[in-house]
Amino acid sequence: MAQYASYRWLKTRKNRLNTQCEVKDMDEIYETQPERTDLPLVVIPVIIESMIESFEKNFELFKDIARVRMYKDFTLDEDTIVARCVEADAIIVIGFHCADSILDRLNAKCYAFGGTGVASYIDLNKAKERGIRVCNVV
């Protein structure tokens, strides 16, 4: 079972987000509504440190809509990214390319990109053939 972070840290996050959150490994994974397995799972497999707070501030928008699992580190290792996203219904992509080999190994139906130039990060034709929605976060 996942460990909760220190009470003070968790209380701050709960007050700020007004939602239940669970930290599986305080330094690496942040997850909202982990008990709501009836909801789709949105995974942020990697993130740039300066963006963490901005994402956390908006997690409340997902309350009762989707669970969010954010890994609080950055890697370009494809196997790590795939392992983190294997259960994902949707993936928020920040700073890594979704090579065809990633698309081939995952079943997510939506890839939301946190930047511009989406066509440089994913094969749009392959995504369309697979029925994958590709969009921007905002």
Question: What residue ranges belong to the model's regions?
Answer:
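N-terminal glycine-/charge-rich "phosphate-binding" loop or analogous flexible N-terminal tail
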Residues: 2-88
